[in-house]
Amino acid sequence: MSHFLDFKIRIPHLAIFALFLLTGLLPGCGETALVPVIKPDNALLKNPELIALEPSENATKVKRNAKIVLSFNVPLDSLTLTVNAEDTQCSGTIQITSNNFLNCVRMNPLELKDNNKKIILTPKGIYATQKFHQIRLTAEIKNLNGVSLKKEITTNPGFKTTWSQQIGTPGDDSGMAVSVDPKGNIYLAGLTSANESGDKKDLFLAKYAPSGFLNWIQQAGFERSVTAAVLHQKKAGLINLRAYSQEKESSAVILAVYAVDGKKIFSKTIKLNGTAPGNGLTMDKDGHIYIPAATPFNVMKISKTGKIILGTELSPGLRIRALAADTENALYITGSIKQSLDRKKIKGGSDIFLLKISQHGLKRWSRTFGTALNESGTALAIHSDQAVAVAGYIPQAESAAEGDAGAQDAFVVKYNSAGKQQWTYIFKGKNSEQSTVVLWTPEGELLVGGYTESSLKEQHHAGKEDAFLAKFDSAGKLLWLRQFGTEENERPLGLALGREGQIFVTGFTEGQMDGAKFSGGRDIFLVQFDKDGVKQ
């Protein structure tokens, strides 16, 4: 019997297929097969890198509600992207802080764009005022293939927000007067809604630190609407607040004194009969105040204790808009008039007038000017008893030529103390504008604020009524002009100078000034410029 050995060679199928691929031979065919080589996606193996950042590193004057845009080189895994949305704990993989990560800004849920390469962030509220804000990206951030950042990223110093402040209620509020003490603290007074419905009004006083931090705000409790207010700081550290209130068939003067901690020391309301034609209020160096008066008087003087000293009758046709007292207690008055003044005939409509009277009510001199249409002085400022500036509005030249009471131009004119005109400047826009406030600097330069419905010289129009601020030298040369605002209406009503020449502007806005929080109706704004017109 023969025995045959049965050798069985077992070759795995994959090995045979691999051999087939290596030889490149197909049975019955002499051609070589081309086999594609699959390469890994190197993009998914790359570490995520931050390639662009908005606002940029070291950016300044960033709006307080600005969005943050982070752009990366590769798509990111959304599951690794988190922010602290519920509290101020620095807990997410993306963190924003203004105090070295002791706590972080609450953020809205993030938004992804550009195939997950771009992250859009917005704050739930607003950023802190005039602070550097750093951004931290932790190493837990990954791309779609699970590859992390090489290391944690922290911007330094980050971006810096604006100084601008905004406060208000759901009703209509307005800043009217502002003052700065020797330490740089800012005091702000004006009108606010006294109840939720907004139908009751009251006077308020607020104190800000130089950094913009709101130290306190007090509602005076007079429960009256006010049309003008002034602030004066005593050497003893007390703040004098004076306001003029006009309501139907009734007007009143409000006197109050506050300590620097916000405590009310003294207050008094002096009720007057009738309603005066016009508004305005000023305080002389002795603390006495002057206001428009009801018939038969035009101006009333009230002592610092609230006693009525005298009433002065000037002309029955005066509508007073502004008053200012010099260091000798002489009084300047401006506004509009519809009849002759001191035998000076008006040109038509209502003309602008400027009067100077002594502290005893005796008239020194008067000036009138205007067109066939309506115009008015709205603001006054005195410089060292040597010059007086009058600001207001006049009809645009085209409107005056056609006899059409349409658009208006803002103006400012300088007189010397004897009533001689020195120079005039007219702000020209396509639509209406008015000057509303003026202030001299100690160096004799003049600041003029107002509002415009269009773009002034080389300026951008944000929308509706924008605020503007201009600075002139003593000869009337325009040094700079700035236009600012929101898409809604703004009007500046008060100016003050800081200890280093800063310029503080207050008034009202119906939008978000530099990204600040909007409460509704009209809000109070407070913004700061340096002496060269750079907004802070």
Model-derived features with residue positions:
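Intrinsically disordered, low-complexity segments
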Residues: 2, 76, 146-149, 301, ...
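Ala/Thr-enriched low-complexity intrinsically disordered regions
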Residues: 15-18, 23
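C-terminal motif of bacterial Sec signal peptides marking the signal peptidase cleavage site
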Residues: 26-28
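Bacterial N-terminal signal peptides that target proteins for export
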Residues: 2-15
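Acidic, low-complexity Ser/Thr/Gly/Pro-rich repeat segments typical of extracellular/periplasmic
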Residues: 31-161
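A sequence-level/structural motif corresponding to short, flexible coil/turn segments enriched
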Residues: 159-536
